[in-house]
Amino acid sequence: MTVTDIASRTYNHGWRLDPIVRSLLDTDFYKLLMLQMIREFYPDQKVTFSVINRTKRVRLGDVIDEGELRAQLDHARTIRFSKKELIWLAGNTFYGKTHMFSPDFLAWLANFRLPEYELHKADGQYELHFHGLWTHTTMWEIPALAIVNELRSRQAMKGQGRFALDVLFARAKAKLWAKVERLRKLEGLRLSDFGTRRRHGFLWQRWCVEAVKEGLGSSFTGTSNVLLAMDNDLEAIGTNAHELPMVAAALAKDDDELRFAPYRILDQWRQTYAGNLLIALPDAFGTKAFLRDAPDWVADWTGFRPDSAPPIQAGEEIIAWWKSKGRDPRQKLLVFSDAMDVESIEQIHQRFSDQVRLSFGWGTNLTNDFVGCSPDGSVDLDPISLVCKVTSVDGRPAVKLSDNPEKATGDPAEIARYLRVFGDAGRVRTPVFV
């Protein structure tokens, strides 16, 4: 394995276009899994995705050159799935299952391209939207976020000398390795990379994945990044995301349909994957509401991915719910992935490792932790909270309530309606950093 000298490559960067996204597999695995289901059940649905910068103090419109942003987005639209990539998707085993993707779906992917985008500036921020069929706009989420984040990183490093860059990356590497040394001590740890969307850059994510693979050995279970999984012979990790219940809810004709929407689309997911990949994401409209109204069959699923509630609180609540349904939590799985870092992983592991099966998705704090690493003390490389969410479905506003009101998205009037239907119980406002 050849280790890239990232500092030298950054210093020598001077060509007209250094593509940030070079493959459509440079995305999260669950985007492909969801895409296959979307194409089956919602082939004609029109859905808009929008990039949202929750870190308002960082004025991306002032930091990132619009011409460079357009060039990267335009380049991404030229990429197609390669024959090699499609053969790998067809022949690889995912979660112990062969032929995860149907021949018809893979044939359709062969002609796939990202749709057009809409971009303009307002109040120092970029407004970046993707309109069109859900089968196409969904695939913009990860490359759009990766492009914006890496352009910001490149801008922050412009003008730094060769040795300053060398020190920057040396400190970041040492910082990550110190985390690895702590995580090694956790018996039975299962951890994967979830850091594509808000990474510092592709080369840095690749270095992090290769380092953690060596440092944690069998405790490192894989990566959500499909390209890195293919290139490094790792498991591709992922199930589903908030966009599924958000779209289903936006399509609901009345409040009763709205209340049942999260379960209807999970049932469609179950049909698509024949009982595999049964990890539910409960917090789109509040975890308490999800558990309160869940059909009994949800308790038979493999587990949950608590995403926005305080993790200890969420874990306790879900374990209690399983017990109330007569299920043994020790046979169930909790996947924690919300802003995980070494301290929170240690705390959750200590609290729950003897009560339930645990897995961790390590995201931004794995692939973009340069806090305190800059030789000049700059904070321009500190990570920001950047998301790409469904904002409308067939012209109707989409909503995410979340267990944390700071993460809520949608039209205020629609948010109020959703709160009337789902309630506000269990929602806790906490600061969002990544």
From Swiss-Prot:
It catalyses: nicotinate + 5-phospho-alpha-D-ribose 1-diphosphate + ATP + H2O = nicotinate beta-D-ribonucleotide + ADP + phosphate + diphosphate. Pathway: Cofactor biosynthesis; NAD(+) biosynthesis; nicotinate D-ribonucleotide from nicotinate: step 1/1. It comes from Bradyrhizobium sp. (strain ORS 278). One of its GO terms (biological process) is NAD biosynthetic process via the salvage pathway. This is Nicotinate phosphoribosyltransferase. Keywords: Ligase, Phosphoprotein, Pyridine nucleotide biosynthesis. GO terms for molecular function: nicotinate phosphoribosyltransferase activity. It is an enzyme of class 6 (ligase). Pfam families: NAPRTase (PF04095), NAPRTase_N (PF17767). InterPro entries: N/Namide_PRibTrfase, NAPRTase_N, Nic_PRibTrfase, Nic_PRibTrfase-Fam, Nicotinate_pribotase-like_C. Belongs to the NAPRTase family.
